[in-house]
Amino acid sequence: MKIEARAPTRIDLAGGTLDIWPLYLFHEGAQTVNCAITRYASCRIETHRGPGITLVSRDTRRSETFASLTALARARRYRLPLLAHLVRYFQPRSGFTLTTNSEAPAGAGIGGSSAMAVAICAAL
């Protein structure tokens, strides 16, 4: 089975990071204004027989493979921590390859990691 999902990144128009802890503790009632842009984070899951899990990030050119979900959960460090932690949370029942790609440059401040998390959650 193949599942694909994507989510747009965003830009801040006003309010910047006032919605992030601990800043919102000091600015009661603070609001932010954002809008989605056409730079997407996307993921594809391809299931296969067997328990193996492979995580691939095309834009960062990183990957890692685990013999099973148990092996992933027992790992102390990850090359792709966002992907690994989301897989641990959802605990899929079969083996698969999860491939991601982001059109947003790393560190650009346009919500690339959040958009990636949304896309992965939708696919899982």
Identify the residue ranges that each predicted region occupies:
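Stable alpha-helical structural segments in soluble proteins, enriched in small hydrophobic residues
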Residues: A115-L124
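ATP-binding N-lobe of GHMP and related small-molecule kinases
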Residues: M1-I110, A122-A123
